[in-house]
Regions:
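N-terminal core-binding DNA-recognition domain of tyrosine recombinases/integrases
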Residues: 9-104
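DNA breakage-rejoining catalytic core of tyrosine-based enzymes
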Residues: 100-119, 169-181
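Basic, Lys/Arg- and aromatic-enriched nucleic-acid-binding interface segment
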Residues: 114-143, 262-268
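Short, charged phosphate-coordinating catalytic segments
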Residues: 135-159, 284-285
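Conserved tyrosine-mediated DNA breakage-rejoining catalytic core shared by Y-recombinases
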Residues: 148-186
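Short functional hotspots where side chains directly engage DNA or cofactors
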Residues: 159-165, 249-289
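Active-site/catalytic core of tyrosine-dependent DNA strand-transfer enzymes
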Residues: 178-241
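Short basic/aromatic active-site micro-motif
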Residues: 221-265, 277
Length: 289
């Protein structure tokens, strides 16, 4: 392991800011950054070697790779965390605009849904990961929820019940089991989990398993997971309203009749609750408006 990779790993281990998932994501991003700096010719660095030229070269590379604004901003957050922990916060501009990083676009009428390809899923070697990915798309679960869920406990026949300890914000919620495909998937999940969560017994902690989970997904080309929640939201909207959402080419809110607007609002409220959001407005991110 190179010095910089080791130093950043130790920096993360000694500074436990945020949730377990946040810590794991940060460590993963910083390891990637260390590798990219090495590839760009910056050798023999340590955690205290970060300079403005390194930041500028990294951003130049990310922009050239046409990464999404959200991905770049997440990496910038990790860079700022690194700089702050080593007393060098002043070497990075406070605003991403200083580096011509575009603003993140939250609401569009373009679908970001990701349909899980059967061939890609079959390339995953850990059965519990296959199930988790399918649960994300079939029920709109977040990554952490799809891993921590205990299928036997969650299955209430006509719905899935998520414990507060599994969910973001600690909010218990229920998601309908409304199709034969969903029912079959829940039954498969119960067989794989054997009465426990979808974390295999050989992994000591959630964080240990999360690293393996991420590695397996990246190996087959899955680098982000939120698209699976988009897929659920858009399919659920179609089920509740009988039409496609704006992000899938359906009519926008301005094109709906008064009666259709009532149905649209009711569907968005239901989907918002099923996905663990407190506000109907957030559904515009998944469905368009």
């Amino acid at each position: 392991m190179r010095d910089l990779n080791y130093d950043l790993k130790q920096l993360c281990r000694h500074n436990r800011d945020g949730s377990f998932a946040t810590q794991a994501d940060r460590e993963h991003i910083l390891d990637l950054i260390a590798n990219q700096l090495h590839e760009m010719g910056f050798r023999h660095m340590n955690a205290h070697s970060l300079k403005p030229k390194h930041v500028e070269k990294l951003i130049e590379r990310w922009l050239a790779e046409s990464l999404s604004a959200g991905t770049i901003k997440n990496r910038m957050s990790a860079l700022r965390w690194w700089a702050q922990k080593t007393g060098k916060e002043n070497i990075i501009a406070r605003s991403n605009a200083a580096y011509d990083i575009p603003d993140r676009v939250y609401v569009t009428n373009v679908s970001k849904a990701r349909e899980l390809a059967i061939a890609a899923i079959e390339g995953i070697r850990t059965e519990s990961i296959k199930i988790s990915l399918q649960l994300q798309a079939a029920f709109g679960l977040r990554r952490e929820e799809s891993i921590k869920i205990i299928p036997k406990w969650a299955d209430r026949g006509d719905r899935l019940v998520l414990k507060d300890s599994w969910t973001k914000g600690g909010r218990t919620r229920e998601i309908p089991i409304s199709t034969p495909e969903q029912r079959q998937l829940v039954d498969e999940a119960k067989v794989v989990a054997k009465g426990k969560s979808l974390i295999p017994s050989r992994f000591a902690t959630y964080v240990d398993y999360l690293k393996h989970f991420r590695y397996e997904c990246e190996r087959i080309g899955i680098h982000a997971f939120h698209g699976h929640r988009h897929f659920y939201a858009q399919g659920r909207y179609r089920e509740l309203t009988g039409r496609e959402c704006p992000a899938r080419g359906g009519p926008t809110s301005k094109q709906l009749t008064r009666e259709q607007k009532v149905i649209d609002h009711q569907a968005r409220v239901a989907i918002s609750h099923e996905m663990g959001h407190g506000r109907e407005q957030i559904t515009a991110v998944y469905l368009g408006r």
